[in-house]
Amino acid sequence: MGSCASCANKDKCSSASKDGGCSSSVPAKLGTNYGNIKNVIGVISGKGGVGKSTVTGILATQLAKKGYKVGVLDADITGPSMPRFFGINEKRADIVAMDSEGKQVKFVPVKTELGIKVISMNLLMEVEDDPVIWRGPMVTGVLNQMFKDTDWEELDYLLIDMPPGTSDITLTVMQTFPIKELVIVSTPQDMVSMIVKKLVTMAHKMNVCVRGVVENMAYIECECGKKMRVFSKKSSEEHAEYLGLPLIGELPINLDLTEALENGKAEEYVAENPLYSLIFEGLY
């Protein structure tokens, strides 16, 4: 169950249930044409470069390990990175015409080693590093189509890797997607926390429940086992308290994970590392 009990805005948020958790009821919004999705979870950050996509990949991997049917929608249209995390960046999603004129299409997502279904702009383009040079309405229109027209089949969880900040995409997802709750990713700096707080305030104004915050790059672990906080003397709990959110967990700076990401082996590394199971244990 989600926990909004520590949120300063819980009395104003229609997503907060009487017992202090996020309401399980989700208002009818944008639907899917192919498949059924039980839970839609948004993963978001206030700024780029804090490891939001990495956290999305870690959470998706942990859910798949538990036996859940999981999908990932890479909503960062102009800066997609989920295919790289899962090592599927050389593959492409199939686009199937559903009528004779080709006006209605179906996207067939790419599956990872654990069976996670992924759709991303980079899986729909011929060349991975070609830029997407579109204005807001075009970007949001394509994102809506990726959500509606992907063949998700049956999913227990769809994780949406959202772009950072409070842009058009964020507004579109919060307004029109059937988001159950958000997981916010931050790093231990006051400047980052200040910007994240804007995002938290936006979520409350949009009546979107925030499950809590994951603090990434919280520390480096010495070979002796001591945790060294290199970016802030404040604890993760203090940063979470400033945001008015429960602390889901803290992730270290991990060079082995970085190397696995570079080699397209992050999913395998995360699945085998007990640290990530412990951090997200009990979240879903």
Curated annotation (Swiss-Prot):
<keyword id="KW-0408">Iron</keyword>
<comment type="similarity">
    <text>Belongs to the Mrp/NBP35 ATP-binding proteins family.</text>
</comment>
<keyword id="KW-0411">Iron-sulfur</keyword>
<dbReference type="GO" id="GO:0016226">
    <property type="term" value="P:iron-sulfur cluster assembly"/>
</dbReference>
<dbReference type="InterPro" id="IPR027417">
    <property type="entry name" value="P-loop_NTPase"/>
</dbReference>
<dbReference type="GO" id="GO:0140663">
    <property type="term" value="F:ATP-dependent FeS chaperone activity"/>
</dbReference>
<dbReference type="GO" id="GO:0005524">
    <property type="term" value="F:ATP binding"/>
</dbReference>
<protein>
    <recommendedName>
        <fullName>Iron-sulfur cluster carrier protein</fullName>
    </recommendedName>
</protein>
<comment type="subunit">
    <text>Homodimer.</text>
</comment>
<keyword id="KW-0067">ATP-binding</keyword>
<dbReference type="InterPro" id="IPR033756">
    <property type="entry name" value="YlxH/NBP35"/>
</dbReference>
<keyword id="KW-0547">Nucleotide-binding</keyword>
<dbReference type="InterPro" id="IPR000808">
    <property type="entry name" value="Mrp-like_CS"/>
</dbReference>
<dbReference type="GO" id="GO:0016887">
    <property type="term" value="F:ATP hydrolysis activity"/>
</dbReference>
<feature type="binding site">
    <location>
        <begin position="46"/>
        <end position="53"/>
    </location>
    <ligand>
        <name>ATP</name>
    </ligand>
</feature>
<dbReference type="InterPro" id="IPR044304">
    <property type="entry name" value="NUBPL-like"/>
</dbReference>
<keyword id="KW-0479">Metal-binding</keyword>
<dbReference type="Pfam" id="PF10609">
    <property type="entry name" value="ParA"/>
</dbReference>
<dbReference type="GO" id="GO:0046872">
    <property type="term" value="F:metal ion binding"/>
</dbReference>
<comment type="function">
    <text>Binds and transfers iron-sulfur (Fe-S) clusters to target apoproteins. Can hydrolyze ATP.</text>
</comment>
<keyword id="KW-0378">Hydrolase</keyword>
<dbReference type="InterPro" id="IPR019591">
    <property type="entry name" value="Mrp/NBP35_ATP-bd"/>
</dbReference>
<dbReference type="GO" id="GO:0051539">
    <property type="term" value="F:4 iron, 4 sulfur cluster binding"/>
</dbReference>
